[in-house]
Amino acid sequence: MICKKALESAEGDETKALEWLKKQGVEMAESKSQRTTKDGLIEAYIHSGGRVGVILELKSETDFVSKNPLFKEAAHNVAMHIAASSPENIDALLQQPYIKDASVTVGGYLNSIVQKFGEKIELARFERFEI
């Protein structure tokens, strides 16, 4: 239904419709930013060779989302990204091009997860270890 609305608002232009959908997704994520995240999970990732490791806390509003395989996959993907890119802090991480798709930032990737669940999702903290 939302795709139909996007195409109608873009007068059939697929490129403009995609831009409209992205804008709607950002607005959706912003509208959820004031909600409380009281659930979530801890993800631990150890890179092959055992010399780099990451632990992170990815939070959600409900356990329904935090137990979902897509949410768990997102936590794992962000942990792998942190292992590969060594960001200094959360703000720097969210601005980095996402390692699996450089056309989007890590923040944009997390916003796409927000859109799929309709809940606020927040990267609360992370730590990267390297020997």
Feature-to-residue mapping (PLM):
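N-terminal assembly/interaction segments in proteins that build large macromolecular machines
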Residues: 1-131
